[in-house]
Regions:
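Substrate-binding/active-site clefts of carbohydrate-active enzymes
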Residues: 1-68, 88-98, 114-116
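Active-site-proximal helices and loops of the catalytic beta/alpha 8
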Residues: 2-8, 60-62, 66, 71-170
């Protein structure tokens, strides 16, 4: 959220601290402080582990799927949002969207297979983009002398983590 957005201006206490206990700025610390880091000094991160914050945020997402015929969400920066948010959102969708309609949720997480697969379950997301395979595909198709066996190895590795039954997104 931008610092000028009414949500932040009306609720600055909803943001995570910009400064860490050691006095350093908590910006762009994608892995060390992935749930609290700010994307920049003007882009506060909301404390989505706090029910006072995640309840209205999940209600906002629910509004879109209950008032419009969307069939899914693409969630950016999945790893920067705690599991309690994803579980709450998915529960609300399942409780409030007709049984005749399935809402597909795909996440975007750069990271290890363990991190990516941690968000795929019946209580959270349906799928994730598999950037590990994407990077291997780009190398295979766009560079010289990269064997298809490298891409095949990444695909097999991914199946080992996510299962053959999971639909993993590959950005093309």
């Amino acid at each position: 959220v931008h610092q000028e957005h009414p949500l932040y201006r009306n609720n600055p206490q909803w943001a995570t601290p910009l400064y860490l206990p050691d006095g350093t700025m908590n910006t762009e610390k994608w892995d060390e402080h992935r749930l609290t880091t700010w994307f920049d000094t003007f882009m506060p991160t909301l404390d989505l582990e706090n029910p006072e914050v995640y309840e209205p945020m999940t209600d906002s997402a629910l509004f879109w799927v209950t008032h419009y015929p969307f069939d899914g969400f693409r969630h950016d920066a999945t790893k920067h949002i705690p599991e309690v948010f994803w579980r709450t959102l998915t529960r609300k969708i399942k409780q409030n969207v007709s049984d005749k309609r399935t809402i597909f949720q795909i996440g975007e997480t750069y990271g290890s297979h363990d991190l990516i697969s941690g968000y795929i379950s019946s209580g959270m997301l349906n799928s994730q983009f598999d950037f590990n395979v994407y990077d291997a595909a780009v190398a295979t198709f766009a560079r010289k002398n990269v064997p298809f066996s490298d891409l095949n190895s990444k695909l097999i590795e991914g199946f080992g983590y996510y299962g053959w039954h999971n639909l993993m997104g590959i950005i093309t």
